[in-house]
């Protein structure tokens, strides 16, 4: 699914006629049809982000989504999720946003998770406002805890 979405964003095609490839294409098309209409601008695809001296990762997209600068990530799942079940995804969005802010001097306002199941059930989770700021704070606390534990175990 991720490969199809990445190729779509880059204006390229991808053909995989295996059963898994056909399913991945259907899932990607669901995300494109239901999640991409609100994508107004793409800054980058498969963007490697890092917070100097602390961590690194790669997000699927950075851009403007529903009028806000956003970190956008695609997720495939076997069954639909409730918002309270995706805490780790929300923290991941916050981590990417903090890294983007630090390196590029931005103020990413929003995390967007576009999710699809194998039977093409689409879900969109948007984290912004105070909730997004809170997740940024929670992620920084986790980083502090990690480095404190690492220091104590040395």
Q: Which role does the model predict for each range below?
A:
Residues 1-56:
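Metal-dependent nuclease catalytic cores that hydrolyze phosphodiester bonds in DNA/RNA
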Residues 43-150:
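Mg2+/Mn2+-dependent nuclease catalytic core
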Residues 152-154:
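Acidic, carboxylate-rich catalytic segments that either coordinate divalent cations
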């Amino acid at each position: 699914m991720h490969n199809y979405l990445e190729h779509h964003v880059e204006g390229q095609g991808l053909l995989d006629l295996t059963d898994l490839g056909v399913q991945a294409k259907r899932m990607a098309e669901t995300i494109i049809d239901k999640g991409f209409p609100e994508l107004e601008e793409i800054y980058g695809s498969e963007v490697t982000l890092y917070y100097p001296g602390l961590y690194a990762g790669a997000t699927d997209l950075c851009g403007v989504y529903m009028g806000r600068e956003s970190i956008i990530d695609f997720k495939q799942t076997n069954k639909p999720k409730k918002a309270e079940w995706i805490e780790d995804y929300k923290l991941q969005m916050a981590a990417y946003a903090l890294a983007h802010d630090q390196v590029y001097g931005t103020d990413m306002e929003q995390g967007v998770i576009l999710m699809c199941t194998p039977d093409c059930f689409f879900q969109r989770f948007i984290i912004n406002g105070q909730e997004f700021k809170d997740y940024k704070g929670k992620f920084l606390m986790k980083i502090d805890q990690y480095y404190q534990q690492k220091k104590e175990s040395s």
